[in-house]
Protein backbone atom coordinates (compact mmCIF):
# COMPACT_ATOMS: atom_id res chain seq x y z
CA UNK A 1 0.00 0.00 0.00
CA UNK A 2 2.83 2.40 0.91
CA UNK A 3 4.59 1.71 -2.39
CA UNK A 4 1.44 2.49 -4.36
CA UNK A 5 1.00 5.80 -2.52
CA UNK A 6 4.61 6.76 -3.23
CA UNK A 7 4.19 5.92 -6.93
CA UNK A 8 1.02 7.99 -7.12
CA UNK A 9 2.75 10.94 -5.47
CA UNK A 10 5.67 10.76 -7.90
CA UNK A 11 3.19 10.77 -10.79
CA UNK A 12 1.41 13.86 -9.49
CA UNK A 13 4.63 15.78 -8.80
CA UNK A 14 6.59 14.66 -11.84
CA UNK A 15 6.24 17.98 -13.74
CA UNK A 16 7.85 19.78 -10.84
CA UNK A 17 10.68 17.28 -10.32
CA UNK A 18 11.53 17.07 -14.03
CA UNK A 19 11.60 20.82 -14.52
CA UNK A 20 8.42 20.91 -16.62
CA UNK A 21 5.51 23.20 -15.74
CA UNK A 22 1.79 22.69 -15.95
CA UNK A 23 0.14 25.16 -18.38
CA UNK A 24 -3.30 25.75 -19.85
CA UNK A 25 -3.71 25.02 -23.55
CA UNK A 26 -5.46 28.37 -24.06
CA UNK A 27 -2.37 30.17 -22.72
CA UNK A 28 0.15 28.48 -25.02
CA UNK A 29 1.98 30.66 -27.61
CA UNK A 30 0.79 28.59 -30.57
CA UNK A 31 0.57 30.06 -34.05
CA UNK A 32 -3.20 29.93 -34.38
CA UNK A 33 -3.53 32.11 -31.27
CA UNK A 34 -0.99 34.75 -32.32
CA UNK A 35 -3.70 37.37 -32.88
CA UNK A 36 -5.12 36.83 -29.38
CA UNK A 37 -3.95 39.72 -27.15
CA UNK A 38 -1.76 38.22 -24.40
CA UNK A 39 -1.73 41.25 -22.10
CA UNK A 40 -4.67 41.97 -19.77
CA UNK A 41 -6.60 45.13 -20.54
CA UNK A 42 -7.32 47.81 -17.98
CA UNK A 43 -10.94 48.33 -16.84
CA UNK A 44 -11.13 51.58 -18.80
CA UNK A 45 -9.14 50.39 -21.83
CA UNK A 46 -12.09 50.79 -24.27
CA UNK A 47 -11.99 54.51 -23.53
CA UNK A 48 -8.53 55.05 -24.94
CA UNK A 49 -10.41 56.01 -28.13
CA UNK A 50 -14.07 56.29 -27.13
CA UNK A 51 -15.26 58.51 -29.96
CA UNK A 52 -14.58 55.88 -32.65
CA UNK A 53 -16.54 53.13 -30.93
CA UNK A 54 -19.35 55.51 -30.04
CA UNK A 55 -19.57 56.95 -33.56
CA UNK A 56 -19.67 53.51 -35.15
CA UNK A 57 -22.35 52.31 -32.77
CA UNK A 58 -24.45 55.42 -33.42
CA UNK A 59 -24.01 54.98 -37.18
CA UNK A 60 -25.19 51.37 -37.06
CA UNK A 61 -28.18 52.30 -34.91
CA UNK A 62 -29.14 55.02 -37.39
CA UNK A 63 -28.64 52.96 -40.56
CA UNK A 64 -28.68 49.24 -39.77
CA UNK A 65 -32.18 47.78 -39.33
CA UNK A 66 -30.91 44.91 -37.17
CA UNK A 67 -29.03 47.28 -34.86
CA UNK A 68 -32.14 49.46 -34.59
CA UNK A 69 -34.29 46.42 -33.83
CA UNK A 70 -31.87 45.15 -31.17
CA UNK A 71 -31.74 48.49 -29.34
CA UNK A 72 -35.49 49.01 -29.54
CA UNK A 73 -36.13 45.45 -28.32
CA UNK A 74 -33.96 45.95 -25.23
CA UNK A 75 -35.42 49.41 -24.57
CA UNK A 76 -39.02 48.25 -24.89
CA UNK A 77 -38.47 45.19 -22.71
CA UNK A 78 -36.50 46.93 -19.95
CA UNK A 79 -38.41 50.22 -19.81
CA UNK A 80 -41.60 49.58 -21.76
CA UNK A 81 -44.46 51.85 -22.68
CA UNK A 82 -45.19 52.83 -19.06
CA UNK A 83 -41.63 52.99 -17.77
CA UNK A 84 -40.50 51.95 -14.31
CA UNK A 85 -42.84 53.71 -11.90
CA UNK A 86 -42.57 54.11 -8.11
CA UNK A 87 -45.45 53.13 -5.85
CA UNK A 88 -45.30 55.30 -2.73
CA UNK A 89 -46.88 54.40 0.58
CA UNK A 90 -48.47 57.84 0.84
CA UNK A 91 -51.21 58.43 -1.72
CA UNK A 92 -50.69 62.20 -1.54
CA UNK A 93 -47.03 61.77 -2.43
CA UNK A 94 -48.07 59.41 -5.23
CA UNK A 95 -50.45 62.00 -6.68
CA UNK A 96 -47.78 64.70 -6.51
CA UNK A 97 -45.27 62.44 -8.29
CA UNK A 98 -47.71 61.50 -11.05
CA UNK A 99 -48.49 65.16 -11.68
CA UNK A 100 -44.77 66.01 -11.88
CA UNK A 101 -43.89 62.95 -13.99
CA UNK A 102 -46.26 64.04 -16.77
CA UNK A 103 -44.02 67.04 -17.61
CA UNK A 104 -40.61 66.58 -15.99
CA UNK A 105 -38.45 67.16 -19.08
CA UNK A 106 -36.27 70.27 -19.10
CA UNK A 107 -37.29 70.93 -22.71
CA UNK A 108 -40.98 70.61 -21.85
CA UNK A 109 -41.65 67.92 -24.47
CA UNK A 110 -41.22 64.57 -22.70
CA UNK A 111 -42.67 62.85 -19.67
CA UNK A 112 -41.04 60.37 -17.26
CA UNK A 113 -41.67 57.42 -19.55
CA UNK A 114 -40.20 59.09 -22.63
CA UNK A 115 -37.18 60.42 -20.72
CA UNK A 116 -36.37 56.92 -19.45
CA UNK A 117 -36.64 55.46 -22.94
CA UNK A 118 -34.26 58.08 -24.38
CA UNK A 119 -31.87 57.52 -21.49
CA UNK A 120 -31.76 53.74 -21.90
CA UNK A 121 -31.40 53.97 -25.67
CA UNK A 122 -28.45 56.34 -25.20
CA UNK A 123 -26.83 54.00 -22.67
CA UNK A 124 -27.22 50.99 -24.96
CA UNK A 125 -25.89 52.71 -28.07
CA UNK A 126 -23.28 55.07 -26.62
CA UNK A 127 -22.45 53.15 -23.46
CA UNK A 128 -23.36 55.84 -20.95
CA UNK A 129 -25.46 58.94 -20.39
CA UNK A 130 -25.73 61.86 -17.99
CA UNK A 131 -28.93 63.15 -16.38
CA UNK A 132 -28.90 66.75 -15.15
CA UNK A 133 -31.25 67.46 -12.22
CA UNK A 134 -32.20 71.09 -12.84
CA UNK A 135 -34.14 73.41 -10.58
CA UNK A 136 -36.94 74.56 -12.86
CA UNK A 137 -39.83 76.79 -11.82
CA UNK A 138 -41.79 75.73 -14.90
CA UNK A 139 -42.04 72.10 -13.74
CA UNK A 140 -45.52 71.23 -12.39
CA UNK A 141 -45.82 70.78 -8.63
CA UNK A 142 -42.13 70.35 -7.86
CA UNK A 143 -39.60 72.76 -9.46
CA UNK A 144 -37.27 70.07 -10.76
CA UNK A 145 -36.67 68.92 -14.33
CA UNK A 146 -34.51 66.28 -16.00
CA UNK A 147 -32.17 66.67 -18.96
CA UNK A 148 -30.53 63.66 -20.63
CA UNK A 149 -27.10 64.24 -22.19
CA UNK A 150 -24.97 61.89 -24.25
CA UNK A 151 -21.33 61.08 -23.37
CA UNK A 152 -20.08 63.55 -25.99
CA UNK A 153 -21.00 66.35 -23.54
CA UNK A 154 -18.20 65.28 -21.16
CA UNK A 155 -15.14 67.52 -21.53
CA UNK A 156 -12.42 64.86 -21.50
CA UNK A 157 -9.68 67.47 -21.92
CA UNK A 158 -10.12 68.44 -18.27
CA UNK A 159 -7.40 66.56 -16.39
CA UNK A 160 -5.42 67.39 -13.24
CA UNK A 161 -4.35 65.72 -10.01
CA UNK A 162 -8.01 65.13 -9.00
CA UNK A 163 -9.68 65.10 -12.41
CA UNK A 164 -9.39 62.37 -15.03
CA UNK A 165 -10.92 62.84 -18.49
CA UNK A 166 -13.54 65.28 -17.26
CA UNK A 167 -14.52 63.42 -14.06
CA UNK A 168 -13.43 64.91 -10.74
CA UNK A 169 -12.82 62.47 -7.88
CA UNK A 170 -12.76 62.63 -4.11
CA UNK A 171 -10.90 59.50 -3.19
CA UNK A 172 -12.48 56.71 -5.23
CA UNK A 173 -15.84 58.46 -5.58
CA UNK A 174 -16.73 60.85 -8.40
CA UNK A 175 -17.41 64.34 -7.07
CA UNK A 176 -18.58 66.01 -10.28
CA UNK A 177 -18.32 66.29 -14.05
CA UNK A 178 -17.05 68.89 -16.50
CA UNK A 179 -19.81 69.15 -19.11
CA UNK A 180 -20.00 71.25 -22.26
CA UNK A 181 -22.75 73.86 -22.33
CA UNK A 182 -23.59 72.87 -25.92
CA UNK A 183 -23.24 69.70 -27.93
CA UNK A 184 -19.62 69.85 -29.16
CA UNK A 185 -20.44 67.82 -32.26
CA UNK A 186 -22.59 70.64 -33.66
CA UNK A 187 -21.04 73.14 -36.02
CA UNK A 188 -20.26 76.43 -34.31
CA UNK A 189 -21.01 75.09 -30.82
CA UNK A 190 -19.26 76.65 -27.85
CA UNK A 191 -16.56 74.49 -26.28
CA UNK A 192 -16.95 76.07 -22.87
CA UNK A 193 -17.51 73.51 -20.11
CA UNK A 194 -18.91 73.95 -16.60
CA UNK A 195 -18.48 71.89 -13.46
CA UNK A 196 -21.60 70.02 -12.28
CA UNK A 197 -21.46 68.23 -8.89
CA UNK A 198 -22.79 64.69 -8.52
CA UNK A 199 -25.70 66.01 -6.44
CA UNK A 200 -27.03 67.59 -9.64
CA UNK A 201 -25.82 65.06 -12.21
CA UNK A 202 -26.29 61.31 -12.56
CA UNK A 203 -23.82 59.19 -14.53
CA UNK A 204 -25.62 56.13 -15.89
CA UNK A 205 -23.59 53.24 -17.30
CA UNK A 206 -23.11 49.51 -16.92
CA UNK A 207 -19.55 48.70 -15.75
CA UNK A 208 -18.14 45.76 -17.69
CA UNK A 209 -15.17 45.21 -15.35
CA UNK A 210 -14.21 45.88 -11.76
CA UNK A 211 -13.01 49.45 -11.41
CA UNK A 212 -14.54 50.67 -14.67
CA UNK A 213 -15.41 54.36 -14.46
CA UNK A 214 -16.95 54.64 -17.92
CA UNK A 215 -19.31 52.54 -19.97
CA UNK A 216 -18.99 51.25 -23.49
CA UNK A 217 -21.61 50.58 -26.15
CA UNK A 218 -23.59 47.41 -25.59
CA UNK A 219 -23.29 46.89 -29.35
CA UNK A 220 -19.49 46.65 -29.16
CA UNK A 221 -19.27 42.81 -29.25
CA UNK A 222 -21.48 42.62 -32.34
CA UNK A 223 -20.68 45.84 -34.22
CA UNK A 224 -18.47 44.12 -36.80
CA UNK A 225 -20.96 41.29 -37.26
CA UNK A 226 -23.83 43.75 -37.70
CA UNK A 227 -21.99 45.78 -40.31
CA UNK A 228 -20.63 42.83 -42.29
CA UNK A 229 -23.99 41.06 -42.31
CA UNK A 230 -25.65 44.24 -43.54
CA UNK A 231 -23.05 44.57 -46.32
CA UNK A 232 -23.56 40.92 -47.25
CA UNK A 233 -27.32 41.38 -47.49
CA UNK A 234 -26.92 44.55 -49.56
CA UNK A 235 -24.53 42.76 -51.94
CA UNK A 236 -26.98 39.88 -52.31
CA UNK A 237 -29.78 42.35 -53.03
CA UNK A 238 -27.75 44.20 -55.68
CA UNK A 239 -26.76 40.91 -57.30
CA UNK A 240 -30.39 39.80 -57.43
CA UNK A 241 -31.54 43.15 -58.83
CA UNK A 242 -28.89 43.02 -61.53
CA UNK A 243 -29.82 39.47 -62.43
CA UNK A 244 -33.51 40.36 -62.55
CA UNK A 245 -32.88 42.89 -65.33
CA UNK A 246 -32.40 39.96 -67.80
CA UNK A 247 -30.82 42.04 -70.56
CA UNK A 248 -29.66 40.86 -73.97
CA UNK A 249 -26.36 41.85 -75.58
CA UNK A 250 -25.61 42.01 -79.32
CA UNK A 251 -22.07 40.74 -79.88
CA UNK A 252 -20.13 41.96 -82.91
CA UNK A 253 -18.09 39.46 -84.87
CA UNK A 254 -15.61 42.21 -85.71
CA UNK A 255 -14.55 42.56 -82.07
CA UNK A 256 -13.68 45.86 -80.44
CA UNK A 257 -15.09 47.51 -77.35
CA UNK A 258 -17.72 50.12 -78.21
CA UNK A 259 -18.46 50.66 -74.50
CA UNK A 260 -15.08 52.36 -74.15
CA UNK A 261 -16.43 55.31 -76.13
CA UNK A 262 -17.52 58.29 -74.06
CA UNK A 263 -21.24 58.30 -73.32
CA UNK A 264 -21.74 54.84 -74.82
CA UNK A 265 -22.63 53.00 -71.60
CA UNK A 266 -26.37 52.20 -71.78
CA UNK A 267 -28.63 51.73 -68.80
CA UNK A 268 -29.83 48.21 -68.04
CA UNK A 269 -33.60 47.87 -67.89
CA UNK A 270 -35.84 44.80 -67.72
CA UNK A 271 -36.08 43.27 -71.18
CA UNK A 272 -33.60 45.69 -72.74
CA UNK A 273 -31.35 44.81 -75.69
CA UNK A 274 -27.94 46.44 -75.54
CA UNK A 275 -26.51 47.03 -79.00
CA UNK A 276 -22.74 46.90 -79.07
CA UNK A 277 -22.18 47.18 -82.85
CA UNK A 278 -24.03 46.26 -86.00
CA UNK A 279 -23.82 42.65 -86.33
CA UNK A 280 -24.03 39.17 -85.66
CA UNK A 281 -24.66 37.47 -82.39
CA UNK A 282 -27.15 37.81 -79.53
CA UNK A 283 -26.16 36.72 -76.04
CA UNK A 284 -28.44 36.82 -72.98
CA UNK A 285 -27.29 37.47 -69.43
CA UNK A 286 -27.50 34.64 -66.93
CA UNK A 287 -28.90 35.83 -63.58
CA UNK A 288 -26.74 34.50 -60.72
CA UNK A 289 -28.68 32.04 -58.59
CA UNK A 290 -29.32 32.67 -54.91
CA UNK A 291 -27.07 30.50 -52.79
CA UNK A 292 -28.81 27.47 -51.32
CA UNK A 293 -27.13 28.16 -47.96
CA UNK A 294 -28.24 31.81 -47.92
CA UNK A 295 -31.01 31.47 -45.32
CA UNK A 296 -29.08 29.17 -42.95
CA UNK A 297 -26.07 31.47 -43.11
CA UNK A 298 -28.10 34.60 -42.34
CA UNK A 299 -29.91 32.84 -39.50
CA UNK A 300 -26.60 31.69 -38.02
CA UNK A 301 -25.23 35.23 -38.11
CA UNK A 302 -28.38 36.66 -36.54
CA UNK A 303 -28.25 34.04 -33.79
CA UNK A 304 -24.66 35.06 -33.11
CA UNK A 305 -25.67 38.72 -32.89
CA UNK A 306 -28.66 37.92 -30.68
CA UNK A 307 -26.47 35.90 -28.32
CA UNK A 308 -23.99 38.77 -28.05
CA UNK A 309 -26.80 41.13 -27.02
CA UNK A 310 -28.69 38.73 -24.78
CA UNK A 311 -31.81 38.84 -26.96
CA UNK A 312 -33.74 35.81 -28.22
CA UNK A 313 -33.13 35.27 -31.92
CA UNK A 314 -36.86 35.32 -32.62
CA UNK A 315 -37.28 38.78 -31.10
CA UNK A 316 -34.29 40.17 -32.98
CA UNK A 317 -35.15 38.77 -36.41
CA UNK A 318 -38.93 38.43 -36.20
CA UNK A 319 -38.48 34.92 -37.62
CA UNK A 320 -40.89 32.57 -35.83
CA UNK A 321 -40.71 29.76 -38.38
CA UNK A 322 -38.61 27.45 -36.21
CA UNK A 323 -40.08 28.29 -32.81
CA UNK A 324 -41.81 25.65 -30.74
CA UNK A 325 -43.79 26.34 -27.60
CA UNK A 326 -41.06 24.88 -25.38
CA UNK A 327 -38.17 26.68 -27.07
CA UNK A 328 -40.04 29.98 -27.15
CA UNK A 329 -40.90 29.74 -23.47
CA UNK A 330 -37.33 28.80 -22.51
CA UNK A 331 -35.97 31.75 -24.50
CA UNK A 332 -38.37 34.20 -22.88
CA UNK A 333 -37.55 32.92 -19.38
CA UNK A 334 -33.85 33.59 -19.91
CA UNK A 335 -34.61 36.95 -21.52
CA UNK A 336 -36.74 37.87 -18.51
CA UNK A 337 -33.70 37.35 -16.26
CA UNK A 338 -31.62 39.58 -18.53
CA UNK A 339 -34.29 42.29 -18.46
CA UNK A 340 -34.67 42.13 -14.68
CA UNK A 341 -30.89 42.48 -14.29
CA UNK A 342 -31.01 45.71 -16.31
CA UNK A 343 -34.08 47.00 -14.50
CA UNK A 344 -33.06 46.31 -10.91
CA UNK A 345 -29.29 46.33 -11.34
CA UNK A 346 -28.94 49.47 -13.46
CA UNK A 347 -32.03 51.61 -13.99
CA UNK A 348 -33.57 51.53 -10.52
CA UNK A 349 -30.42 52.09 -8.39
CA UNK A 350 -28.60 54.49 -10.73
CA UNK A 351 -31.51 56.49 -12.17
CA UNK A 352 -34.91 55.99 -10.55
CA UNK A 353 -33.95 56.04 -6.87
CA UNK A 354 -31.59 59.06 -7.09
CA UNK A 355 -34.24 61.02 -8.98
CA UNK A 356 -36.87 60.21 -6.34
CA UNK A 357 -34.52 61.26 -3.53
CA UNK A 358 -33.71 64.57 -5.20
CA UNK A 359 -37.37 65.14 -6.10
CA UNK A 360 -38.43 64.58 -2.47
CA UNK A 361 -35.72 66.97 -1.21
CA UNK A 362 -36.85 69.74 -3.54
CA UNK A 363 -40.53 69.09 -2.81
CA UNK A 364 -39.96 69.44 0.94
CA UNK A 365 -37.76 72.51 0.48
CA UNK A 366 -40.42 74.42 -1.47
CA UNK A 367 -43.33 73.21 0.65
CA UNK A 368 -44.92 71.06 -2.04
CA UNK A 369 -45.22 68.28 0.55
CA UNK A 370 -45.06 68.20 4.36
CA UNK A 371 -41.61 67.82 5.86
CA UNK A 372 -42.69 64.60 7.59
CA UNK A 373 -44.34 63.13 4.46
CA UNK A 374 -43.58 59.46 3.90
CA UNK A 375 -41.67 59.26 0.61
CA UNK A 376 -40.84 55.58 0.98
CA UNK A 377 -41.22 53.72 -2.31
CA UNK A 378 -43.16 50.59 -1.54
CA UNK A 379 -42.40 48.96 -4.87
CA UNK A 380 -40.93 49.78 -8.26
CA UNK A 381 -43.34 48.69 -10.97
CA UNK A 382 -41.46 47.57 -14.07
CA UNK A 383 -42.96 46.34 -17.37
CA UNK A 384 -43.75 42.66 -17.37
CA UNK A 385 -42.68 40.23 -20.08
CA UNK A 386 -45.74 38.17 -20.94
CA UNK A 387 -45.15 34.48 -21.40
CA UNK A 388 -46.49 32.35 -24.24
CA UNK A 389 -49.02 30.49 -22.10
CA UNK A 390 -50.87 33.29 -20.34
CA UNK A 391 -53.39 30.90 -18.80
CA UNK A 392 -50.77 28.88 -16.95
CA UNK A 393 -49.13 32.11 -15.75
CA UNK A 394 -52.41 33.33 -14.28
CA UNK A 395 -53.12 29.98 -12.63
CA UNK A 396 -49.62 30.00 -11.13
CA UNK A 397 -50.17 33.49 -9.73
CA UNK A 398 -53.52 32.39 -8.34
CA UNK A 399 -51.94 29.44 -6.54
CA UNK A 400 -49.15 31.64 -5.15
CA UNK A 401 -51.67 34.10 -3.72
CA UNK A 402 -53.88 31.37 -2.25
CA UNK A 403 -50.85 29.66 -0.70
CA UNK A 404 -49.66 32.91 0.85
CA UNK A 405 -46.46 33.07 -1.19
CA UNK A 406 -47.43 36.40 -2.79
CA UNK A 407 -49.92 39.21 -2.28
CA UNK A 408 -52.50 40.54 -4.67
CA UNK A 409 -50.67 43.86 -4.58
CA UNK A 410 -47.48 42.20 -5.82
CA UNK A 411 -49.22 40.32 -8.63
CA UNK A 412 -51.22 43.36 -9.73
CA UNK A 413 -48.17 45.61 -9.42
CA UNK A 414 -46.31 43.54 -12.03
CA UNK A 415 -48.91 44.60 -14.59
CA UNK A 416 -48.25 48.30 -13.94
CA UNK A 417 -51.40 48.92 -11.88
CA UNK A 418 -51.90 49.78 -8.21
CA UNK A 419 -53.93 47.24 -6.26
CA UNK A 420 -55.88 50.08 -4.65
CA UNK A 421 -56.92 51.42 -8.06
CA UNK A 422 -57.94 47.95 -9.24
CA UNK A 423 -60.04 47.44 -6.09
CA UNK A 424 -61.79 50.76 -6.62
CA UNK A 425 -62.57 49.86 -10.24
CA UNK A 426 -63.92 46.44 -9.23
CA UNK A 427 -66.13 48.02 -6.56
CA UNK A 428 -67.38 50.60 -9.05
CA UNK A 429 -68.12 47.90 -11.63
CA UNK A 430 -70.05 45.85 -9.06
CA UNK A 431 -72.18 48.83 -8.03
CA UNK A 432 -72.99 49.62 -11.65
CA UNK A 433 -73.79 45.98 -12.46
CA UNK A 434 -76.09 45.68 -9.42
CA UNK A 435 -77.95 48.85 -10.35
CA UNK A 436 -78.56 47.45 -13.84
CA UNK A 437 -79.43 43.96 -12.65
CA UNK A 438 -76.45 42.37 -14.40
CA UNK A 439 -74.64 39.22 -13.26
CA UNK A 440 -71.18 38.28 -14.52
CA UNK A 441 -69.05 35.20 -13.96
CA UNK A 442 -66.28 37.54 -12.75
CA UNK A 443 -68.37 38.47 -9.67
CA UNK A 444 -67.69 35.83 -6.97
CA UNK A 445 -70.55 37.24 -4.89
CA UNK A 446 -73.04 35.77 -7.34
CA UNK A 447 -71.28 33.04 -9.34
CA UNK A 448 -68.84 30.25 -8.54
CA UNK A 449 -65.75 29.33 -10.54
CA UNK A 450 -67.92 26.82 -12.40
CA UNK A 451 -70.32 29.58 -13.46
CA UNK A 452 -73.11 28.50 -11.13
CA UNK A 453 -75.04 30.84 -8.88
CA UNK A 454 -73.45 31.37 -5.49
CA UNK A 455 -75.78 30.15 -2.70
CA UNK A 456 -77.18 32.88 -0.50
CA UNK A 457 -76.63 32.84 3.25
CA UNK A 458 -80.17 31.51 3.78
CA UNK A 459 -79.59 28.70 1.26
CA UNK A 460 -76.30 27.74 2.90
CA UNK A 461 -77.97 27.68 6.34
CA UNK A 462 -80.82 25.54 5.01
CA UNK A 463 -78.37 23.04 3.51
CA UNK A 464 -76.48 22.76 6.77
Set out the residue ranges of the language-model regions.
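Flexible loop/turn segments at secondary-structure boundaries
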Residues: 138-141, 184-186, 282-283, 315, ...
